[in-house]
């Protein structure tokens, strides 16, 4: 696979993981997953992690995966490169895993005394990637190993933080986020 093809493949494969957290923010509100509970004097997760956001984010990412599968032949032909398709299990693994990764990061932030929205460099950019990849591997191991080769994983780990910083900066400038990270 050529370098450009690898980048396109990697970004396409990760789209169902890139969307859930954005959809969760847009869905907003609802009951916090931690129910307001504290541990060691700090919230377990905080108000930003809700059942509604988790469900809507997971549904959005899964729906996107299934939609991408429908258009993959046309997009592949237009771009002149092969692209992966997504089984329901793969899409669900990526989407739900992205949400779990973000929830895990919130837990770690609370344990280290960081408030909601506080920056945690590195973790903020890759938490959902780790969750998505782990859950996709568990949900669809054959698909995962065929889709996420070492070069593809390298692109994901390098490109995702850049995309994260750029998209969050745009969301901040548009008034959709309170912080630019």
Swiss-Prot record:
It is found in: Cell membrane. GO terms for biological process: glycerophospholipid biosynthetic process. It catalyses: 2,3-bis-O-(geranylgeranyl)-sn-glycerol 1-phosphate + CTP + H(+) = CDP-2,3-bis-O-(geranylgeranyl)-sn-glycerol + diphosphate. Its cofactor is Mg(2+). It is a multi-pass membrane protein. GO terms for molecular function: CDP-2,3-bis-(O-geranylgeranyl)-sn-glycerol synthase activity. It is an enzyme of class 2 (transferase). One of its GO terms (cellular component) is plasma membrane. The chain crosses the membrane at residues 7-27, 55-75, 88-108, 126-146, 147-167. Its EC number is 2.7.7.67. Its main location: membrane. Keywords: Cell membrane, Lipid biosynthesis, Lipid metabolism, Magnesium, Membrane, Phospholipid biosynthesis, Phospholipid metabolism, Transferase, Transmembrane, Transmembrane helix. Pathway: Membrane lipid metabolism; glycerophospholipid metabolism. Belongs to the CDP-archaeol synthase family. Catalyzes the formation of CDP-2,3-bis-(O-geranylgeranyl)-sn-glycerol (CDP-archaeol) from 2,3-bis-(O-geranylgeranyl)-sn-glycerol 1-phosphate (DGGGP) and CTP. This reaction is the third ether-bond-formation step in the biosynthesis of archaeal membrane lipids. PANTHER family: CDP-ARCHAEOL SYNTHASE. NCBIfam families: PRK04032.1 (NF003114). This is CDP-archaeol synthase.
């Amino acid at each position: 696979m050529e370098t450009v093809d690898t980048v396109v493949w990697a970004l396409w494969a990760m789209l169902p993981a890139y969307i859930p957290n954005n959809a969760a923010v847009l869905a907003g509100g609802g009951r916090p997953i931690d129910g307001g509970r504290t541990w060691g004097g700090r919230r377990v997760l905080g108000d930003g992690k809700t059942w509604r956001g988790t469900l809507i984010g997971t549904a959005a990412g899964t729906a996107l995966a299934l939609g991408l599968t429908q258009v993959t032949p046309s997009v592949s032909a237009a771009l002149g490169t092969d692209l992966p398709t997504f089984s329901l299990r793969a899409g669900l693994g990526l989407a739900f895993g992205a949400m779990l990764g973000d929830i895990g990061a919130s837990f770690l932030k609370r344990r280290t005394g960081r408030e909601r929205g506080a920056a945690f460099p590195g973790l903020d950019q890759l938490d959902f990637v780790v969750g998505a990849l782990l859950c996709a591997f568990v949900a669809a191991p054959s698909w995962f190993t065929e889709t996420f080769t070492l070069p593809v994983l390298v692109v994901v780990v390098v490109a995702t933080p850049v995309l994260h910083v750029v998209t969050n900066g745009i969301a901040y400038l548009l008034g959709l986020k309170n912080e630019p990270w």
